[in-house]
Amino acid sequence: SEMCIRDRPKAMSGNIYAFPQSEFGLKGRAFVFGELKSPRLRGGYEVTNLSIPELLLTLKQSDLDFKGHSADFAVRDLMLNGSDMQINGTFSTLPSTNFEISKLDVSSKYLNVDKVMNVSERALKYAPKTPAKTSASSQPADIPVIIYNGSINFARIVTGNIDIRNTQAGISLANNIFNIRNLRTRAFDGRVRGNISMNLITSLLNIRLTGRGIDVEKALLDAAGMKDTLSGTAAFETDISLKGATYEEQMRSLKGTVGFDVRNGQFGPFGKLENLIIAENIRESQLFQTALGGVISGLTTIDTTHFSELKGTLSFNDGICNLKPVTSLGNILSLHIAGEFDLLRNYADMKVRARMASLVSNLLGPIGAINPANLINSAASLNIVTAKAFSIFCEMIPEDEMSAIPSFSNKYVDNAATKFQLVVRGDAAKPLTLVKSFKWLATETEYQSAVDYVNSIPEPVEGSEATTIEEVVQEVDA
């Protein structure tokens, strides 16, 4: 059967019942004709000067034009609590189980996410209460919307202290999955590209992004409020997935990898040598307490925080971030960091191995003297008790592990460079309490040479007041 329905063109004004302060203008007409299973529509409607103060929302104009089996719509100057939005699109008017949008273009000159969320929160207060679920195991219904082809173009997006510019991407929606493809944007003075998809029912999020020229210091400060932690210019690549409504759910479900490369940067307090050397076992040892103050003051003028490159790969699974590994190249200190970080407990458990220039290790006093590589050279003035205890502050590792510690960034060859290892463990919110252990590293040959030398030191004669190895040797020879 066929039908023909026509309304009369008439301008009108009114308000929305649920929002007493609202107002709008409406005019237009529509024709419906053809078969019921495939009706054709002509005409259109125009909404003007919509204002809903309760939602902090205004709309200058919205047009709906029927084109037979489809309709074009346009939203002009939609303001959401100070954020503007322009929307254009086309959807099918044919009867279907899904609302099919063939084209959807969204643009904005300024979008403040936090203020827009305020609009959303206000709207939820007016939404009808959701009926109780009949079964805890019942699955949410599929979203009956398909977006075949769309785009976003946002000149500026602000959330918190994060300011993102020139965001462009293609968008689509099908089978509950919202896709953002060919994303291009500028953030933290750098460029970000990639693809993002999200299942709107399960909240599963897949993120594949690459970044170049990112200001790390700005990113950490603006995004996480972390000041003086790390600086430099970064490139990164992510291939991760996560889901969940809470931070705990998201971190526990987080899977995938993040690779990064930071150039010409600087560590915060953690990279200062005085904070690395003064580990818990050094602080608590009676062997170094009298000399510790002088050692620390001598190190404060040495800059070990700068690096030419910091790079690595992070892998995520079951709430744990694994460093596989992370390395840094500095002029006088290079690092090899491996271990894991518990994202839920904010807890670190890592080993930091370092190559340190000999000119710096020479400033470490008795701590530097018990390095197996230096022990024989510095032994003459070394306390005999300290010398015999060297093995407590030394760890022997295979040659291949030793060679994995990076060289210096300036390609300077320092054959007398020393290597040490830190055990970093504890609450990341207390960075200066994390360094539990400091030990010199030695190959089997270096370690055995030191052991042989210490074993060759004669025992002091009875009643001797000699304290250094040199004094003991002189007494015995006498």
Language-model-detected regions and their locations in the chain:
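Tryptophan-anchored aromatic micro-motifs
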Residues: 45, 106, 147-157, 257-265
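Solvent-exposed loop/turn segments connecting transmembrane beta-strands
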Residues: 20-25, 52-56, 79-86, 159-163, ...
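Flexible, solvent-exposed coil segments and beta strand-coil junctions
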Residues: 8-12, 41, 65-70, 147-150, ...
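Transmembrane beta-strand segments that form the barrel wall of outer-membrane beta-barrel proteins
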Residues: 9-15, 44-49, 70-78, 151-155, ...
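Short, small-residue-biased leader/transition segments that mark boundaries at the very start
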Residues: 2-5
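Flexible beta-edge/linker motif
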Residues: 31, 90-116, 146, 248-250, ...
